[in-house]
Regions:
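N-terminal, positively charged nucleic-acid-binding surface of large information/translation enzymes
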Residues: 10-13, 19-105, 143, 469-476
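Anion (oxyanion) recognition and catalysis
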Residues: 56, 130, 461
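Alpha-helical recognition segments enriched in aromatics with Gly/Pro capping
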Residues: 1-34, 49, 120-325
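Short, glycine/charge-rich beta-strand/loop segments that flank catalytic centers
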Residues: 68-72, 94-97, 107-122, 140-149
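Structural preference for alpha-helix termini/caps and helix-kink/transition segments
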Residues: 264, 272-479
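Short, polar/flexible loop-turn hinges at active-site or ligand-entry regions and domain interfaces
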Residues: 82-88, 109, 297-301
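Short phosphate-binding/catalytic loops that engage adenosine nucleotides
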Residues: 60, 134, 465
Length: 479
């Protein structure tokens, strides 16, 4: 099955065919750097990171551009609130952004342009639109003329007559039409000198100018959250088509919302959790797994229960991985004939690719990984007749599927250690006390002092410690 993507522009799944063979140009709208990123931002970052990883897995050379909006009224307001320079606000929250992305194992894009480094490109684009009578200057502002673009509404499906009827309540005397939007806004400091007077760029022109510079007049994929379809991406199409006469993007891809109590998580509604808040209580990889457990276009419900469930799933994944690696530790995988070919033809690899080729259906892909984990655990226990070679091939197929999803970037031991540290922050348990009780239970069992063994076990249970007796001793972890 060839790769199929749902194109917001055509409202259907389409076979993905890039402009250039084995090359992909992808632009994703980044964050406005005035605050810490929330879980909604995490979802967008993880979704398009997974696209990036899967395209590379398929053998594409990907030029991935993700921008920073580093000039905006919100940034200036935050600078005033904190009593610092607006550029210091940028530095602070860009650094925080990179910290958050690192925790979530987000791969670095090819290019990460900042809006303020591309003012000249915006000037050039705005002037081109003015020269073609598709934009006009009005008292220091420059507006895009909606009437100059007959296809306005093609992405969102909105009717321009309905929009105009709704826009008449907010009259701006500077505009020829209430729907016209700003390309350049006259402003107080900070501002840039321009042919139209001092001011700042409009939000929409920033992305059009940067995507054009780094990916050309037309490129393969433009991504972002569903909330950007209108007006941001609709306006990008209008600007870019107006400037070049070409549709700027072949496939528009949008991820669904993260919801809390059936409402979109957002700063404007005040119902958001920052990535760093969540990662104090849950492992960052748990958050990543949770956010890819649903199809990227579907809404996903954020709740403690869902994160607890994701923790259990990821712990089970790492436990299975540890067992399989231990089972094949002494096997030289390189000596297995056609090892990589066998991995490529393994049933998990085939099912995983089929799911991912169906509009990047990570939910189904993870269901296949769950199924294969059960098979792998059975094989590790010596049941089912699987050879060590079979286990090694299945393990590698499973690892590669996880890598595409951005999972398993730690060893099982590292994951368990970090998970314990996160869970123990609130409980502040004494590890030496836990080890002492486990040793005491072991001694009591050897002496057949069952009452004492039960007492040690009960005390561990009260502490929230789960124990498991294995041939190699007693393993433990926190609930």
């Amino acid at each position: 099955m060839s790769l199929q993507l749902f194109n917001t522009l055509t409202r259907k799944k389409e076979e993905f065919t890039p402009l250039k063979e084995k090359q992909i140009g992808m632009y994703v709208c980044g964050v406005t750097v005035y605050d810490y990123c929330h879980v909604g931002h995490a979802r967008a970052a993880i979704v398009f990171d997974t696209f990036y990883r899967y395209f590379q897995y398929l053998g594409y050379e990907v030029r991935f551009v993700r921008n920073f909006t580093d000039i905006d009224d919100k940034i200036i307001n935050r600078a005033n609130e904190e009593g610092i320079d607006w550029q210091e606000v940028n530095r602070k929250y860009i650094a925080a952004f990179y910290e958050d992305m690192g925790k979530l194992n987000i791969a670095a894009p090819t290019v990460e342009p900042k809006a303020t480094d591309h003012i000249q490109e915006m000037f050039d684009m705005i002037q081109s639109l003015i020269d073609q009578d598709k934009a006009y200057e009005s008292d220091g502002d420059v507006f895009y003329s909606i009437k100059s673009f007959k296809e306005y509404g093609c992405l969102s499906g909105k009717n321009i007559d309905d929009l105009q009827a709704g826009a008449r309540v907010e009259v701006n005397e500077s505009k020829r039409d209430p729907l016209d939007f700003a390309l350049w806004k006259k402003s107080k400091p900070p501002f840039w000198e321009s042919p139209w007077g001092p001011g700042r760029p409009g939000w929409h022109i920033e992305c059009s100018a940067m995507s054009k510079k780094y990916l050309g007049d037309t490129f393969d994929i433009h991504g972002g959250g569903k909330d950007l379809v209108f007006p941001h991406h609709e306006n990008e199409i209008a600007q870019s088509c107006g400037c070049t006469g070409k549709q700027p993007v072949r496939y528009w891809v949008h991820n669904g919302f993260v919801n809390i109590d059936k409402e979109k998580m957002s700063k404007s509604l005040g119902n958001f959790f920052t990535i760093r808040e969540v990662c104090k209580k849950y492992h960052p990889e748990v958050l990543r797994l949770f956010l890819i457990s649903s199809h990227y276009r579907s809404p996903i419900d954020f709740s403690e229960k869902n994160l607890e469930d994701a923790t259990k799933v990821l712990s089970r994944f790492y436990e299975g991985l540890a067992g399989a690696r231990e089972k094949t530790a002494n096997l030289n995988k390189e000596s297995i004939p056609n090892f990589q070919e066998k991995v490529k033809n393994h049933p998990l690899t085939q099912k995983f690719e089929t799911a991912m080729n169906d509009d990047l259906n990570t939910a189904v892909a993870m269901a296949h990984m769950n199924e294969e984990l059960r098979n792998l655990n059975t094989a590790v226990l010596g049941k089912g007749g699987a050879s060590l070679e079979d286990i090694a091939v299945a393990t590698r197929a499973w690892e590669e599927a996880g890598k595409i999803l951005g999972l398993f970037f730690l060893t099982p031991e590292e994951f368990e250690k970090e998970l314990f540290e996160i869970k123990n922050q609130e409980r502040n348990l004494d590890v030496s006390k836990i080890e002492e009780l486990i040793a005491g239970r072991k001694s009591a069992r050897q002496a057949k002092n069952w009452a004492e063994a039960d007492r040690c076990r009960d005390e561990l249970t009260q502490m929230g410690v789960l124990i498991e007796d294995t041939p190699n001793g007693t393993d433990w972890k926190l609930k």
